[in-house]
Curated annotation (Swiss-Prot):
InterPro entries documented for this protein: PAPS/APS_Rdtase, PAPS_reduct_dom, PAPS_reductase_CysH, Rossmann-like_a/b/a_fold
Coiled-coil segments: none
Function field: Catalyzes the formation of sulfite from phosphoadenosine 5'-phosphosulfate (PAPS) using thioredoxin as an electron donor.
Keyword Iron: no
Catalyzed reaction equations: [thioredoxin]-disulfide + sulfite + adenosine 3',5'-bisphosphate + 2 H(+) = [thioredoxin]-dithiol + 3'-phosphoadenylyl sulfate
An annotated GO BP: hydrogen sulfide biosynthetic process
Keywords: Cytoplasm, Oxidoreductase
Family: Belongs to the PAPS reductase family. CysH subfamily.
Protein name: Phosphoadenosine 5'-phosphosulfate reductase
Major enzyme class: oxidoreductase
Single annotated GO MF: phosphoadenylyl-sulfate reductase (thioredoxin) activity
């Protein structure tokens, strides 16, 4: 696998970009998660960033990437509506793993947003998408631009939802390379990694949460529910960061 030219690939139509990356992805599928990170750092352009929602399994990708690339900027888009346990988890992991945390937020405070638009998350799919655009997408786009990112690592896994089931290890999103080192990991592999490295799940894992986002759009898992149904009232799985 050789070095890839981001500018040249960005000039191609989306379908052609996917095809151009197909051979590389076929080879990346044969590598371990650690090998994928090393390959990306050697063959993809910097600057490099890692995004995290500090969700249930966040410690895995944070530890994995940070141990290979210490001091990599870790982007958190903070909506202001995260669980208290999430903010505590952020502090704990930032200290334990010595993370170079970069927090980005919407230009409007949560209270100001509610005054202007009402509770967007109660306004169906359209309202949820507007909420996500304001609180997740715009701050992430700003982060990528301000940090001059050209390669973006994230901790998505195919097993998490139907919308992620066919994601490749390497893609181009928002004009930058996006690398998903643990995309093919199952829940057992996640558990084993956490145990091996003395890491914890998010505190709400023990209370029955399989996925954690904002307080108002996250539900505990109940028998018969798919993991993706615990977010956004089952109307959608993605918050907007990993779409497009």
């Amino acid at each position: 696998m050789s070095q890839l030219d981001l500018n040249a690939l960005n000039e191609l139509p989306k379908v052609d970009r996917v095809l151009a990356l197909a051979e590389t992805n076929a080879q990346l599928e044969t590598l371990t998660a650690e090998e994928r990170v090393v390959w990306a750092l050697e063959n993809l352009p910097g600057e490099y960033v890692l995004s995290s929602s500090f969700g249930i399994q966040a410690a895995v990708s944070l530890h994995l990437v940070n141990q290979i690339r210490p001091d990599i900027p870790v982007i958190l888009t903070d909506t202001g509506y995260l669980f208290p346990e999430t903010y505590q988890f952020i502090d704990e992991l930032t200290d334990k793993l010595k993370l170079n945390l970069k927090v980005y937020r919407a230009g409007e405070s949560p209270a100001w947003q509610e005054a202007r638009y009402g509770k967007l998350w109660e306004q169906g799919v359209e309202g949820i998408e507007k909420y996500n655009d304001i609180n997740k997408v715009e701050p992430m786009n700003r982060a990528l631009k301000e940090l001059n990112a050209q390669t973006w690592f994230a901790g998505l896994r195919r097993e998490q939802s139907g919308s992620r089931a066919h994601l490749p290890v390497l893609a181009i999103q928002r004009g930058v390379f996006k690398v998903l080192p643990i995309i093919d990991w199952d829940n057992r592999t996640v558990y084993q990694y956490l145990q091996k490295h003395g890491l914890k799940y998010h505190p709400l894992w023990d209370q029955g949460y399989l996925s954690v986002g904002d307080t108002h759009t996250t539900r505990k898992w109940e028998p018969g529910m798919a993991e993706e149904e615990t977010r956004f009232f089952g109307l959608k799985r993605e918050c907007g960061l990993h779409e497009g």
